[in-house]
Amino acid sequence: MKHKIIIINGPNLNLLGEREKEKYGNFSLKDVENDCLNFSKKNDMEVSFYQSNVEGELINFIQDSRDNFNGLIINAGGYTHTSVAIHDALKILKIPIIELHISNIYNR
């Protein structure tokens, strides 16, 4: 069975490579997506991407994804620290979830 993974990125991650390069580097979100696609092809996985700056859109997408994927990876950006609603939407899912960040959130 081919694993289907969704990678979700939250607010301002669409501007990777343009903002705070000293913190986030020079790579764009498209660069990250291309790296993920290359990895997924080598490992017989199917990967999809979603990005939004809007909390409600992220929640709707998470809820709508609950039966379509075998795993979810999320970088919720600033919502990591503030959104109980996104946290609650993720708790609904019955698939593995990985939360990740580009920078060390404990050094802020």
Task: Please describe what each predicted stretch is.
Residues 57-61:
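Short acidic active-site motifs
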Residues 32-47:
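A short, N-terminal amphipathic alpha-helix
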Residues 79-108:
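Flexible, gly/pro- and Lys/Arg-enriched active-site loops
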Residues 65-72:
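Short acidic/histidine-rich motifs immediately flanking catalytic phosphotransfer sites
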Residues 46-56:
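Short beta->alpha junction loops
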Residues 1-6:
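Extreme N-terminal starter segment of soluble prokaryotic enzymes
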Residues 16-30:
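Glycine- and acidic-residue-enriched helix-capping/strand-helix junction motifs
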